[in-house]
Amino acid sequence: MTKADINAVIPAMAGIHPPNPVVAYIALGANLGNAVQTVQDAIHTINDLPQTQVTKQSSLYKTAAMESLPGSPKSPDYINAVIEISCHQPATLLLEQLQKIEQKADRIRPYLNAPRTQDLDILLYRDESGDAHIQTETLTVPHPRMWQRAFVLVPLAEIAPQLVSAERLEGLRGQGIERVYAAL
């Protein structure tokens, strides 16, 4: 771990407010209720968080649900997006705020990949020294499975193409994803 890694990790994990704004990328998804409206509402709610501004927003994408229980009924398709935010929140506080937004949308977690009214995940947390590497009981950044999921990488590549290589996108071609609404 370099000095830059340590400087990025300590404030992010310790709840210290960064002196300069950080850039975070957040994945949004929903497949219960009015998923399009739920995702759009979450974007507005995140923009209203203290010292937080949504600076980029991807289009909305439709993807098939990932099932995790054998024999479970087919879940509705997801609506997914990725946003870029500028904020002064430590990553742990940002996670708490995102979880409160999920709770207000009646998010429950009965099992892995269960259908959900709202899903908000911190993908990347970056300051002037680069990407923070965070590992706590409740938060891992970069998100551990983001590089395996078209529903994350395609919208991320739309708003931050420098972060996603063409090779990574090519490796996910078999995962169905359809743009349904252009970025607003």
Predicted regions: what is each one?
Residues T2-V9, M66-I79, Q89-L184:
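Flexible, gly/pro- and Lys/Arg-enriched active-site loops
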Residues P21-Y25:
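Extreme N-terminal starter segment of soluble prokaryotic enzymes
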